[in-house]
Amino acid sequence: MRGTVLCAALATLVACQRVDNTPPASQSPAGTDTGMKVAAPATPPPPTLPSPPTATKVAVVEGFLTPESVKYDTAQDVYFVSNVNGGPLTKDNNGFISRVRPDGAIENLKFVEGAHNGVTLNAPKGLALRGDTLWVADIDVVRAFDAKTGAPRDSVSLASLGAVFLNDIAVAPTGALYITDTGIRFDDVGNVLHPGPDRIFRIGPDRQVTVAVRGDTLGRPNGITLDSVGKRFIIVQFGGRSILAWKPGEKAPSVIAKGPGGFDGVEIAGTRLLVSSWADSTVSSYETGQEVKVITGVPSPADIGYDAKRKRVLVPIFTGSRIEIWQLP
């Protein structure tokens, strides 16, 4: 305020000095007004910054049953979609994984199907790929399938460590798997309970299972992804509002950004850090530490995927039995 008043005063002073250079009244021609007033120049309005470009919806693929996660396989140029097909903690062996082509055509709705061909799959959620192996988080077990044939390859139970709600998986360069345990259950009427604890498990290349990190700072951890540039993992809170960074060996993660909360999926898309939120039905970028909405109007956006070849965000609509494909600008 003081700066504005000072500028106005200086402008008026300059204007008055210009007026004082006019001839005195006695020398002025008759009828000439020598009391001319000069207004201070108006302060120009601040420039209007353009809104950040948003993504464009290019396809909607329907026909799924509670889709939770989408993962892009660069080697096969195909999308995998996990289908819970029921309660997220129900061991009913009716979960399945779909194969979808980038044009939106469902190549095989039940590429991997519980209770078929020797497969056990209850409520599949987060997906991860390493080579031609597709890893799947399934309540308290992590399962592996051949990404080309769908045949079962491996199964690692975390039940003995008290796993409650295995949610998402990320693969380290060493081949170790890091799996979030959101630590939630549901009562008979569907209310969310949080018996905890909040943890991230590690499955080593030797299949040895350990607790990599635990604690309330994880905030019901949901999505996890590897930041290969920062040599760290990015973790998002479902029960809080924080986006976290963590390196193996650290006792606790650090907060790198905050947003609306209710976070589910996280992907690094080029230079963008993309996070989906149930709280406001969006996918936003946080690479600067500030929220920038990229996709809006997506209810229950679960564990998003990213098609790096086409620069597309793959959004599973958990309660809508569909996935939406969005083109980044």
Where would I find each of the regions flagged by the language model?
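Beta-propeller domains
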Residues: S82-N108
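Bacterial signal peptide processing site
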Residues: C16-V19
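A short helix->beta-strand "capping" segment at the edge of beta-propeller domains
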Residues: T43-P67
